[in-house]
């Protein structure tokens, strides 16, 4: 059974993310991804990223997310079109205010697209 989670954006749109462990090998294409920690049964996003190459970017800040923010899982959603990825990213960040995204980003994913603001 595929592990999926729906995350709502600030707009009210639901985005369905799939557990990265079920996407092996990690796809090379564009995607949105989130690092998650669990609060009981509720997933909490600690970082939201978007990239034009999931396999190249998704693990760049994973160690920091685990050690500094308690992240335990990665979920991803494949999105080929950059404008769609960026809009989804902004919607998710606006709703969930992930701690690794607030106060300015210097992290993976967004750096790959040349976007540095949150």
Regions picked out by a protein language model, each given a short descriptive name:
Residues 98-109:
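Coupling/hinge elements of helicase-like and P-loop NTPase modules
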Residues 58-61, 66-99:
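Short, compact, well-ordered microdomains
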Residues 27, 61-65, 109:
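N-proximal short alpha-helices
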Residues 1-57, 83-95, 111-118:
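GIY-YIG nuclease catalytic motif and its immediate N-terminal context
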């Amino acid at each position: 059974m595929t592990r999926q989670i729906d995350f709502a954006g600030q707009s009210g749109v639901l985005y369905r993310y799939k557990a990265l462990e079920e996407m092996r090998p990690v796809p090379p294409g564009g995607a949105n991804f989130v690092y998650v920690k669990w609060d009981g049964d509720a997933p909490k996003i600690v970082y939201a990223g978007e990239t034009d190459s999931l396999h190249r970017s998704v693990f760049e800040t994973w160690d920091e997310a685990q050690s500094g923010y308690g992240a335990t899982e990665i979920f991803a959603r494949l999105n080929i079109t950059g404008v769609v990825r960026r809009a989804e990213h902004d919607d998710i960040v606006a709703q969930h205010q992930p701690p690794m995204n607030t106060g300015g980003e210097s992290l993976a994913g967004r750096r790959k697209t040349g976007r540095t603001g949150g």
